[in-house]
């Protein structure tokens, strides 16, 4: 509250600090607040509009997806889910505990969510779409891995690349699914998606 007063230079600014689960009636629209710190700003918060069964989820459940459509059902579903996974892996990955807490709070409050409108990307509409993203989000936030390995490397003269091949072969011989990424030619944001549910991460760095 004091921060808002200071940055607006209004010492008399009337600020009400809301808590998890607190409701405010705007006159026909009831807002319920869910604190979501570091998702992905320190002051992030989600807001549930009771009458619309709508969760305004801030950065949660979002995607970096350029689309002329507003809704998920205007895109291939697997594309949007993959983009949501990429957004989580690259933006929210370090804050799994906070994401899990926000999900648990929503569950504890018994929110009946039929639409999720994130700050970025398409809107999830209908119970089926909402459940389609809630499940993966709970998994990502929990930190559960899929038992796979990721080998990431760059190589100046080929020696580190040979080492990466050897490490990859060891995982394959052990029956462990493994993917390999050369950072000289691959996008780091795509590598992060593999990191999200990996049990083993091996990084090769040339000297």
Question: Where would I find each of the regions flagged by the language model?
Answer:
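N-terminal beta1-alpha1-beta2 submodule of the flavodoxin-like/Rossmannoid cofactor-binding fold
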Residues: 128-207
